[in-house]
Amino acid sequence: MIEENKHFEKKMQEYDASQIQVLEGLEAVRMRPGMYIGSTAKEGLHHLVWEIVDNSIDEALAGFASHIKVFIEADNSITVVDDGRGIPVDIQVKTGRPAVETVFTVLHAGGKFGGGSYKVSGGLHGVGSSVVNALSTQLDVRVYKNGQIHYQEFKRGAVVADLEVIGTTDVTGTTVHFTPDPEIFTETTQFDYSVLAKRIQELAFLNRGLKISITDKRSGMEQEEHFHYEGGIGSYVEFLNDKKDVIFETPIYTDGELEGIAVEVAMQYTTSYQETVMSFANNIHTHEGGTHEQGFRAALTRVINDYAKKNKILKENEDNLTGEDVREGLTAVISVKHPNPQFEGQTKTKLGNSEVVKITNRLFSEAFQRFLLENPQVARKIVEKGILASKARIAAKRAREVTRKKSGLEISNLPGKLADCSSNDANQNELFIVEGDSAGGSAKSGRNREFQAILPIRGKILNVEKATMDKILANEEIRSLFTAMGTGFGADFDVSKARYQKLVIMTDADVDGAHIRTLLLTLIYRFMRPVLEAGYVYIAQPPIYGVKVGSEIKEYIQPGIDQEDQLKTALEKYSIGRSKPTVQRYKGLGEMDDHQLWETTMDPENRLMARVTVDDAAEADKVFDMLMGDRVEPRRDFIEENAVYSTLDI
């Protein structure tokens, strides 16, 4: 024991100043890039573009830039061009170096902290440019200012040569060109055009009148898009509702400024039952909402109730409409510009400034009250839609109680047809939603009972895109799923109570199976989205073919764009001598016995599963509404445009 203590003391004494590492300049960024850009995977790679684009957007917000161009160059590098004032090139007093060099080599340097350069800013703590420089093999900047073109180049964050004048110009602006470092971005350095284009379009919506374009110069991938919306977020709402039936044609739009905080709101009601509210602060999408959404929601509910009571659409003795009632079918975009935004969490997903609640509430209330008074016919339609939603909510109340559970892992109230697992470890547990009783039987027999649960469903579940809340909660299959998951429903939904952290959709490999899968994904997207966002949702990939020699299946072929090539290769492989392989086609899960289903589709060691994610909520919302909503024309157009990719089940 004494020897052990001596050894411990020796170890403690060895921890001294010589073991403290000091990272200078941008070394810290290269050492821990995830701290600055979130990850070094695809998301972090694209974050580099946003850091540079955000600087140009800041110039636009300040009123000095009107046109931004983004290029994916032929070598997969990025160029961002703006027509702003140009980054300062004079000497920065503290560093003794040109300001533009300081911006790209010193963390936390930028025009965003003093309060004079930019009234509002979307940049992350002002570190963006230097972080991009640190994580690029090469970066160069051209500044068009004071009649001269100034140029400087960097490699992995280090200065290659001093700032120099390389020509004359009669324009102003900044051009930044960079190449991501493959030593940092080991997963991929290939930019996704669609990811960049969607965000650039969003920025054009959020900055009314701004012209912003994206051009892809890569061989075989050449394309470009130009975005410019004089209607701003009003145009954004029209875009979101493009495939929906609207209650009134022109979105309600209001903007105002109070105490230095600018607020814009655009909204429009549709005939759907779903709510789509998107909020932004300084152009940053606040996925988790925040105080601007709180102010908007409170004002919307209060103003509609006041109008309904004053105009006798709601009687004095009738209950007020709830927020849930008045938001049914609503599409809204809220955008605030704040000189000192406070975001909760490192990823800026929730606005935390408490003063924004009352400012948003007041500005929107005044404008919305005016609109209702000036448009009585539209006002009545809005109130009547809320009243219908209220009646459906009351009818659904009893059904909702069925989905509530005392505890996430309590099994006393689980649906009778659920074959549950024995483990209480949600992190390990898997719930398979299986199409049909016969396949459900095979899955129950073939599963690992310790951590795999089976919930069979009969036929096609309800299309929630077209259904009222009372019908949704009256549906037995839907109730069974919510009860089995243990997450609750609606306002009671809590993803942390999920009894399984893998929710696997397992349907037949035919058109009916694809339809059931789509119905389930629609349900999950609309009413269990946190489960989707947590990465819990998967689609099983059962084999589509089995290659048999005699009575033995030698190889299974998984579905995919190369499935026919796989099949051809397998047939050639087993066509040896006199043996003639045959092909077994699996159209239904029930065509496999329990052992085959386990081996091919459920065994974690062998199976192939596709994880379902949502990269773009606005686009996903539009697609679900188009495919599953009431309007036939957009769906028919989509089918005609994509018919070449369709699967015929004949």
Swiss-Prot record:
Cellular component terms per the entry's GO annotation: chromosome; cytoplasm
Record EC number: 5.6.2.2
InterPro entries cross-referenced by the UniProt entry: DNA_gyrase_B_C, GyrB, HATPase_C_sf, Ribosomal_Su5_D2-typ_SF, Ribsml_uS5_D2-typ_fold_subgr, Topo_IIA, Topo_IIA-like_dom_sf, Topo_IIA_B
Cofactor binding: number and manner: Binds two Mg(2+) per subunit. The magnesium ions form salt bridges with both the protein and the DNA. Can also accept other divalent metal cations, such as Mn(2+) or Ca(2+).
CDD domains recorded: HATPase_GyrB-like, TopoII_Trans_DNA_gyrase, TOPRIM_TopoIIA_GyrB
Similarity comment: family membership: Belongs to the type II topoisomerase GyrB family.
Entry protein name: DNA gyrase subunit B
Record lineage: Bacteria, Bacillati, Bacillota, Bacilli, Lactobacillales
Gene giving rise to this polypeptide: gyrB
